[in-house]
Amino acid sequence: MSKLMKKDFNIVQRFPALIAISLIIIFTGLVFLLGEGLNLGIDYKGGAKVEIELVDEITDKEAFEEHFTSFMKGEGYTVVDKMMESPLTEGGISYEFRLAYEYNGAGVEVEAQEAFITRLNNEFKNDLTEEVESYLASVNSSNLFDEEGINVAVIGESSSKSLLNRTFIALALALVAILVYIMIRFTVSSGLASICGLAHDVLITVSLTAIFGKYLPVNMTFIAAIITIIGYSINSSIVIFDKIRECQKSTAFAYASDEEIANYAIKHSLVKILLSILTTLIMVVALVLFSVSTIQEFILPIIFGLLAGTFSALCLNPSIWVLFRKIGSKLKSKKA
C-alpha cells in the first residue's frame, strides 16, 4: 500500500478513458433493456405469492422446487423467479413460489380477475394442500404440515403499477434531498458531481441487472438494494469532497489547480474508501454463504452497486467536480 501511495495519481487527466468504460456498460445494458427488458417481479407487474409452510427444512430443495413448479404449471399457472426460502418467526420454514398474473399462458383480463383470485384461494389452494401431503408421504418425510400452512396473496396489476410509480417518486425525492444536503455542506459543484455519480451508480446497477436479468428479478428487494447503494455511494462521495474542501482551506494549496487538488484528494482518500468497501464486501460474501435465498436475491445488485460506487467516487466524481468548477468560472467571467 505504501508503494501505491508514492505513485502519481493523474486520474482527472484520464477521465475520458474512465468514463468510456462506464458508457460501454450502460450502452450494453440499454441494448438488453430494449431487447428483453428488465425481469420485473410480481411486485411490479402483478401476480401471486404462494407460501408452503413446514415445520422442518426440506432435505432435497431442488427436487421440492422442481416438483411444485411442475405441479403449478399443470394447474395452469406460470412460476416466475426461483423458490424463496425464509424462516418463520413462530418457528418452521416457508417456501414461497411466485406466480405470473396469467392463466394457461394468457394474461388475465380485467373482467376475469375476480375468477382468477377465487380459483387461487379455493380450488388451487385445496389441490396444493393435497399435493404437499402426497409429496411428503412419497419421500417418507416426517415433516409436519396442515392445511393452514398454505398462504396465497394476490397482487393486482393496478396496485403493482401504483407501487412502481411511488417507487420512482421516492427515489427522485431522495436524490433531490441528497443534492441539497451536499450543496449546503460543500458547494454547488460538489452537489452536482455527487448526483452525477449517484446516477452513474444506479445506471450501472440497472444495466448489469438487465444483462444478468435471467437471474435477477426486479422487485422490492431490488429497490432496497438500490437505496442501499445510494447510501454507500454518497458516503464515498462525502469522503472525497471532504478532502477537497480541506485542501481548498489549506494555504499549501493556495496556488494549486483544481486538477491537482482533485488528484491529491483521490490519492489520500483511496485507502479509506477501499477499506470501507472491502469490509462491506466481506459481510456481503458472508450473507451469500450463510443466508436464505430471500437475502441472496439482494446481494448481486449490492455487489454491482458497491463496485460502481467505488469507481465513481475515485475515478469520476472528482473529475466531474473539476468540470463543473470550470463551467462556473466561465459563467462568472462572462457576467463580469
Regions found by a protein language model. Give the residues of each.
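A structural signal for conserved, well-ordered secondary-structure elements
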Residues: 1-336
